[in-house]
């Protein structure tokens, strides 16, 4: 836990979140959690979260285009319903992740220094 908090010092207020010093954070993560050494493939948390967000947006756009295709008559009702259910599941996942991030932030702000 302490080493994870110390890794926050790798972030600079003048750099973007995506510009994390990945060498230090990846090497310290590999030393503190040896079971996840294979999982550290150079991706930062910000890039993974950004990828998930872009996938969610693409899923929602796909569902919207499928609904327009259903209105035009070029897609079946089943295809439209499937894409809408997938978009709803993606949205619920994004909301759940957002709620977890907000609750974690609130817990960090409540910590005494």
Curated annotation (Swiss-Prot):
Entry keyword set: Bacterial flagellum
A Gene Ontology term for the protein's cellular component: bacterial-type flagellum basal body
InterPro entries: FliE
Protein family (similarity comment): Belongs to the FliE family.
MF (Gene Ontology): cytoskeletal motor activity; structural molecule activity
Keyword Kinase annotated: no
Cellular compartment(s): Bacterial flagellum basal body
Gene that this polypeptide is encoded by: fliE
Main localization category: other
Protein name: Flagellar hook-basal body complex protein FliE
Protein's GO biological process: bacterial-type flagellum-dependent cell motility
HAMAP family linked to this entry: FliE (MF_00724)
Disulfide-linked positions: none
